[in-house]
């Protein structure tokens, strides 16, 4: 287990914590990370695309000309696919793009993403993160004091309305709870900041 500094919101050291190597110290599995990101992105798709086939296009109920005697090719409707304004063949229909991944793979992906951030020195542990009231300015000052990059993911152990409201209007800052921890947010962030309580909760689940 590796020792990691625990910081206060003013940047001073509050102590240290031993990170579980099974969660924060494994060799990142790039393939599983790739699969987990694909799964998340697929689940985000709306899937509301739709086109009209020959039965859905308005009109075309009358046969355009008689079957025989005209010398022309036989036609049953002006909404057949070969006609201008006709229906679409095998077009997209509304569907869900989401699919499932085994639980062990999902957890391995989370451990891989967290371990990668630790290896990149893009991981910070805070003693706690609380506000008496929504204070965007204080939150912004904290990110400056801690010298955090533009894209930061804050992970807290439980939902805190004041923290969420304080960070909501700051570009590039995302606040989630441990239950909402996901690979896409971790990978997209330049820095992951977790509270000590959040680290303990994550280790309890993934360790």
Swiss-Prot record:
Listed Pfam families: Ribosomal_L4 (PF00573)
One term under GO cellular component: ribonucleoprotein complex
Keywords of the record: Ribonucleoprotein, Ribosomal protein, RNA-binding, rRNA-binding
Region (Disordered): 50-76
Gene3D superfamilies: 3.40.1370.10
GO molecular function ontology, one term from the record: rRNA binding
GO BP: any one term: translation
Keyword Phosphoprotein: no
Role: One of the primary rRNA binding proteins, this protein initially binds near the 5'-end of the 23S rRNA. It is important during the early stages of 50S assembly. It makes multiple contacts with different domains of the 23S rRNA in the assembled 50S subunit and ribosome.
Assembly notes: Part of the 50S ribosomal subunit.
Family under the similarity heading: Belongs to the universal ribosomal protein uL4 family.
Designated name of the protein: Large ribosomal subunit protein uL4
Source organism per UniProt: Macrococcus caseolyticus (strain JCSC5402) (Macrococcoides caseolyticum)
Lineage of origin: Bacteria, Bacillati, Bacillota, Bacilli, Bacillales
Gene this protein is translated from: rplD
